[in-house]
């Protein structure tokens, strides 16, 4: 069996186009464009690239985006004051704080200070709690994007044995909630998991998000499994690699995401969807 590639770039482009059409429809109804504020602290090169990509995607979709670039020595109090002002700004529907923050700043109270209805990253305890209650509002972007990849590829998660490798707050844990909501029997593997291979071998649907190139051996992949590789790791030769050994996994899987061009584009597309959804929430609040 040779796996069919799940083209995240193409699916993300369709999502962005859909958002663009809905934004245009809003404007024709006399409503304002959705507004996204992106907060960047310090000068981390990778973060600057991510932020630039987000602004570019917003511009193409007609979403109004504003960047707040703060120096690396910004205090906790100053950052909290900025969040408070953005919470009160009626032109801003979504607030995104680009992680990681400099070491002297505590990200948790910053993320929790964002109003839940403006939390377009989906990291606020309120939004994670709603997802756990099976009543999602603003959903974490990467897991939401993965669910869109599955849906657009005609893959039904209901009844599948799903295994998630990685238990981060950003991907692994909310991914488990998404898959349970979709009807999968879900196992989460982490650094204390014994015999990772045995869990991977029984997975109908495998999601790997650890940040270790080649962690999951291709020979472990069950024949006909769906493989979603969230990892993106730069190797010594400068090439990008996922957390799964791609070629041997693709020889066994039915579907697989490439790295790059699989999950990554969906994260930004989901951010646009969340920002539009937040704007619609605010329409209802101010009606």
Curated annotation (Swiss-Prot):
The keyword Oxidoreductase applies. GO terms for cellular component: cytosol. PROSITE patterns: THF_DHG_CYH_2. It catalyses: (6R)-5,10-methylene-5,6,7,8-tetrahydrofolate + NADP(+) = (6R)-5,10-methenyltetrahydrofolate + NADPH; (6R)-5,10-methenyltetrahydrofolate + H2O = (6R)-10-formyltetrahydrofolate + H(+). InterPro entries: Aminoacid_DH-like_N_sf (IPR046346), NAD(P)-bd_dom_sf (IPR036291), THF_DH/CycHdrlase (IPR000672), THF_DH/CycHdrlase_cat_dom (IPR020630), THF_DH/CycHdrlase_CS (IPR020867), THF_DH/CycHdrlase_NAD-bd_dom (IPR020631). GO terms for molecular function: methenyltetrahydrofolate cyclohydrolase activity; methylenetetrahydrofolate dehydrogenase (NADP+) activity. Its EC number is 1.5.1.5, 3.5.4.9. Keywords: Amino-acid biosynthesis, Histidine biosynthesis, Hydrolase, Methionine biosynthesis, Multifunctional enzyme, NADP, One-carbon metabolism, Oxidoreductase, Purine biosynthesis. One of its GO terms (biological process) is methionine biosynthetic process. NADP(+) binds at residues 166-168, 232. It comes from the Bacteria. Coiled coil: none annotated. Pathway: One-carbon metabolism; tetrahydrofolate interconversion. Homodimer. NCBIfam families: PRK10792.1 (NF008058), PRK14186.1 (NF010783). Belongs to the tetrahydrofolate dehydrogenase/cyclohydrolase family. Catalyzes the oxidation of 5,10-methylenetetrahydrofolate to 5,10-methenyltetrahydrofolate and then the hydrolysis of 5,10-methenyltetrahydrofolate to 10-formyltetrahydrofolate. This is Bifunctional protein FolD. It comes from Chromohalobacter salexigens (strain ATCC BAA-138 / DSM 3043 / CIP 106854 / NCIMB 13768 / 1H11). The lineage of its organism: Bacteria, Pseudomonadati, Pseudomonadota, Gammaproteobacteria, Oceanospirillales.
């Amino acid at each position: 069996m040779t796996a069919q590639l799940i083209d995240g770039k193409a699916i993300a482009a369709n999502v962005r186009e859909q958002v663009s059409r809905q934004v245009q429809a809003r404007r024709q109804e006399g409503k304002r464009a959705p507004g996204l504020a992106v907060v960047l602290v310090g000068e981390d090169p990778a973060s600057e690239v991510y932020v630039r990509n987000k602004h570019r995607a917003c511009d193409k979709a007609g979403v109004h985006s504003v960047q707040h670039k703060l120096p690396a020595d910004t205090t906790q109090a100053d950052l909290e004051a900025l969040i408070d002002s953005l919470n009160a700004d009626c032109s801003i529907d979504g607030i995104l704080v680009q992680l990681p923050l400099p070491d002297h700043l505590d990200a948790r109270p910053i993320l929790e200070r964002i109003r839940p209805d403006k939390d377009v990253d989906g990291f606020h305890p309120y939004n994670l709690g709603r997802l756990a209650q099976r009543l999602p509002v603003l959903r974490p972007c990467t897991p939401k994007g993965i669910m869109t990849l599955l849906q657009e590829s005609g893959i039904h998660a209901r009844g599948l044995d799903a295994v998630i490798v990685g238990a981060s707050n950003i991907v692994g844990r909310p991914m488990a909630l998404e898959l349970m909501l979709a009807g999968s029997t879900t196992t989460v593997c982490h650094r204390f998991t014994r015999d990772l291979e045995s869990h991977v071998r029984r997975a109908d649907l495998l999601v790997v998000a650890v940040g270790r190139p080649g962690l999951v051996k291709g020979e472990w992949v069950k024949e006909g499994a769906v493989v979603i590789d969230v990892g993106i790791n730069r190797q010594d030769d400068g090439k990008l690699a996922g957390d799964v050994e791609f070629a041997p996994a693709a020889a066994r899987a039915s579907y697989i995401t490439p790295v790059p061009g699989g999950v990554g584009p969906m994260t930004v597309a989901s951010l646009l969807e969340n920002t539009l959804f937040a704007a619609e929430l605010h329409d209802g609040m101010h009606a």
